[in-house]
From Swiss-Prot:
This is Transgelin-2. The modification Phosphothreonine is found at residue 180. It comes from the Eukaryota. One of its GO terms (biological process) is epithelial cell differentiation. There is a cross-link at residue 171 (Glycyl lysine isopeptide (Lys-Gly) (interchain with G-Cter in SUMO2)). The modification Omega-N-methylarginine is found at residues 182, 196.
Length: 199
């Protein structure tokens, strides 16, 4: 966790909430997908959040992952270099994030560099990788490797085309929100404040 000291009070509660969101089962799925997708020796970390963070921390695995989702010769990250220097590692992580955004991931679904590098929010890192995998499956361009069932299926556009006659008929239908004109009614009820007539 880099050079930060322990957090106390509200900061500690917030950090504990973030740490509870981390999914160990999802970690194993992501590791399996990354090693299958990269098709080269990227290693495999021991189970656990800290080991997962150390595996991805220098950005080389992430850059190899995003490059594997593009056709040969169109890789977005040109130079991937393992380095022990902090700013080089953070630069590679940010290159991955920029490439992921160009690939189609929403800006709101992308983690920040410090979330991974300092290990502050590994659940957010998992969400970004899940979205990337789901988007790769949805593209169906033949570059995805692995089991498509590992990721949630993205919805596809399914437009409905109605004729003018169908649209006109729809205007005549009484919607269920309006109630019904059949069944029980208030017919025969006395007005408000009148005594009940029991015979």
């Amino acid at each position: 966790m880099a050079n930060r000291g322990p957090s106390y009070g509200l900061s500690r509660e917030v950090q504990q909430k973030i740490e509870k969101q981390y999914d160990a089962d999802l970690e194993q799925i992501l590791i399996q997908w990354i090693t299958t997708q990269c098709r080269e020796d990227v290693g495999q970390p021991q189970p656990g959040r800290e080991n997962f963070q150390k595996w991805l921390k220098d950005g080389t695995v992430l850059c190899k992952l995003i490059n594997s989702l593009y056709p040969e010769g169109q890789a977005p990250v040109k130079k991937i270099q393992a380095s022990s220097m902090a700013f080089k590692q953070m630069e590679q992580i940010s290159q991955f994030l920029q490439a992921a955004e160009r690939y189609g991931i929403n800006t709101t679904d992308i983690f920040q560099t410090v979330d991974l590098w300092e290990g502050k929010n590994m659940a957010c890192v998992q969400r970004t990788l899940m979205n990337l995998g789901g988007l790769a499956v949805a593209r169906d361009d033949g570059l995805f490797s692995g089991d498509p069932n590992w990721f949630p299926k993205k919805s596809k556009e399914n437009p409905r085309n109605f004729s003018d006659n169908q649209l006109q008929e729809g205007k005549n239908v009484i919607g269920l929100q309006m109630g019904t004109n059949r069944g029980a009614s208030q017919a025969g009820m006395t007005g408000y404040g009148m005594p009940r007539q029991i015979l």
